[in-house]
């Protein structure tokens, strides 16, 4: 099974999961936008990982574009986020913002807990996150579990868990 792992990471969480997956799966590791459809055509399995930002997967348009011609490859996508866990209905909303339902049928989708690392965010992203956090805390429509998370996001936090990739690796091996 020839596997390519592609990642896009702003805060390091998606990159760390990508390195773990590459080691376990004996896969080739690539940064976002360093590959194209021609290179990926030689792989059986393609994994793309990135963070959710503002309700969508970072780089989702790019991934959709390069994977469209790859009809024979098995496609896996993981998203990292600042929540330790996500309600399925909320997660589906984010997948729907990222990919059409038809395209989702081609994908095996996974959520991996990431966190927040203010130290590596650029000033604009840091400001946007703080404004978003404040808006969520002030909104009367914010769900209680989201409110609890927003209270914790006043500082850097990590929910990374190496064990979180096990369902994904099992699915990749099972579909080989």
Describe the function of each predicted region:
Residues 55-176:
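FMN-binding flavodoxin-like domain, especially the glycine-rich phosphate-binding loop
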Residues 1-71, 166-176:
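N-terminal beta1-alpha1-beta2 submodule of the flavodoxin-like/Rossmannoid cofactor-binding fold
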